[in-house]
């Protein structure tokens, strides 16, 4: 994969390296995807991903969490920021020409309702892009695989549950599960691919433990890295580059979906602004 931007450097200087590493891979996928306006970002969070990924303005960023969405203002990437639940969007039917939801749906208990509502506010034929972890996420965790190899199956199961919990995952489902959800909402999958190999996942997994200094820096100084400069992260960029430049893998822990809104669905009558 080639890119005009060095997404790896851009992300890891702004985030803990394990998160920035993954986001850099995902940013590159969008370079070849069409996002006609008006664009909806479902679960925009603090806006960092969109600010680093897209050159164009995003029309609307939507997120239910008060703190992160107010942080998103600093990037001036969104024309409008809306604090609202994704299952009850305050927009008319067929308003948006495209939508994305980057590493969001796996955290939402009512993912089906969010998909249904996203379909409602999209125009027929509009693209919708999203990425989520799949069952390989828990199966490929290095510590759990070690316990499997030495016969401690109960320890492996407990670790997988623990890591999924700290990752705040509600869903790590296969493409056929998402295909059923999408069909119910009124989407058709055009294509999908797995990415993030077992070795890349191990790098992310151990980053949760080695990233404690970044968390301390964030708490004390309001930033993940005290010196976010190329000279300070060049060694880390070199270490991660082999994974970032070749992210596709049949046993990848994450899946990226390219879908199309293919039919009109009935909008829930009780939507409202959430303040």
Tell where the protein language model's regions lie, with residue ranges:
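Residue-level "edge-of-site" marker
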Residues: 85, 104, 195-196
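Active-site micro-motifs of SAM-dependent methyltransferase domains
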Residues: 88, 106, 137
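Helix-to-beta-strand junctions that scaffold the AdoMet/dcAdoMet cofactor pocket
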Residues: 108-109, 122-124
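S-adenosyl-L-methionine-dependent methyltransferase catalytic module, highlighting the catalytic core
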Residues: 112-117, 127-258, 270
